[in-house]
């Protein structure tokens, strides 16, 4: 006999509602509802700190086929506020699976809903833009009526807007730590960096573990520092290069990070930024950012390298972008999105610093743009 799952409700701030079944923890959650078009990598997506306070809708219909393991995580816990999917398979099939997705969600306290029309939801978000929502997981046997729906819509309306939210310090580490773990290989698992050629200080605005692994793969001993670390403390560590990580929220309120990045870049330290780090570098260089209608979330985004003409398929996860009209003479565009023409990469014309809006570390997604890590290493070699 198939299990009878408790009812669940997704309500958007505009009053749009979806009834489904609960596949995670009981309770209620609110956040900005976004859609991600990746076919795989749900575990990496859930644990990506960049999804803090966001409810993630996965557009691929079957989610959970390969279960969950203890290695493919980008942080120590789930950071997404909630999960929305179409169908949860009843049988898990993968030799690395440690547990089903539903069990993992329950363990992590993540509220999730399945059995809704995710295509309709995605069309709503595409038309109206990302908006706040509320998922409620009810007790078994609950009849979801007008009162329950009204309460969920009210909760969605009351949730704070992502614009103006500084979430980097919410997800950042509390204290510095060292990172030497390298990428996973079949039959070995994760390795450990043996001989380091460079010392990189990585700002943790919500850093993904695979970024740190790819730096370690290239001979970098990484010291990860909290988001609010002043530049003076970084200089004491005598880094060969500084990395500005990905992260959630609006970059403009992160004045502490912008000030530190400006000081580090002006000092001539080789600097590489990704995602939120890209936006912080742009703000530190005098440019402005803006909130996008529904952002870029997926693993199939084509991006053009303006220097080489090469087109790469990239992983993306951001709701803000750099305004090209605000670039000064000290910044030049290096990459653009072929979906909407938004800026995807920048380089300083007067300092050894560059940044990329997407995710060259993938996890999940393609590795086409991974050469940017090699470019960072080359910058450090030039300055050695």
UniProtKB/Swiss-Prot annotation:
Transmembrane segments: none annotated. Keywords: Amino-acid biosynthesis, Arginine biosynthesis, ATP-binding, Glutamine amidotransferase, Ligase, Nucleotide-binding, Pyrimidine biosynthesis. Pfam families: CPSase_sm_chain, GATase. It is an enzyme of class 6 (ligase). The keyword Ligase applies. GO terms for biological process: 'de novo' pyrimidine nucleobase biosynthetic process; 'de novo' UMP biosynthetic process; glutamine metabolic process; L-arginine biosynthetic process. It catalyses: hydrogencarbonate + L-glutamine + 2 ATP + H2O = carbamoyl phosphate + L-glutamate + 2 ADP + phosphate + 2 H(+). The active site is at residues 275, 359, 361. Belongs to the CarA family. HAMAP family: CPSase_S_chain (MF_01209). Small subunit of the glutamine-dependent carbamoyl phosphate synthetase (CPSase). CPSase catalyzes the formation of carbamoyl phosphate from the ammonia moiety of glutamine, carbonate, and phosphate donated by ATP, constituting the first step of 2 biosynthetic pathways, one leading to arginine and/or urea and the other to pyrimidine nucleotides. The small subunit (glutamine amidotransferase) binds and cleaves glutamine to supply the large subunit with the substrate ammonia. This is Carbamoyl phosphate synthase small chain. The lineage of its organism: Bacteria, Pseudomonadati, Pseudomonadota, Betaproteobacteria, Burkholderiales.
